[in-house]
């Protein structure tokens, strides 16, 4: 379990705690992978089990928020994504960082607290 330091985060949505597969945000608790913008949890249809199951529809959802930064938390360990994911994001002219999910939660919190337009998929 990783409890995230709450340094007076002023963002509408942020992580309070992360335990493998369980996310406690300031707005609720979730037991499935999340897609977030800087301001909300985004609803999606196709199930995400791992980095291999991220689909174009998930990336389209994130890209529609016009983020300056995209984070993808790949689970317990940092994993390399399928090339299709990198290509789709690159075609949109966005930067993306892949990291372990606990690190992605911390990074998301730091960026939203700086009022950065960040979106993420956290597995």
From Swiss-Prot:
GO terms for cellular component: plasma membrane. CDD domains: Mth938-like. Signal peptide: none annotated. Keywords: Cell membrane, Membrane. It is found in: Cell membrane. This is 13 kDa major membrane protein. It comes from Francisella tularensis subsp. holarctica (strain LVS).
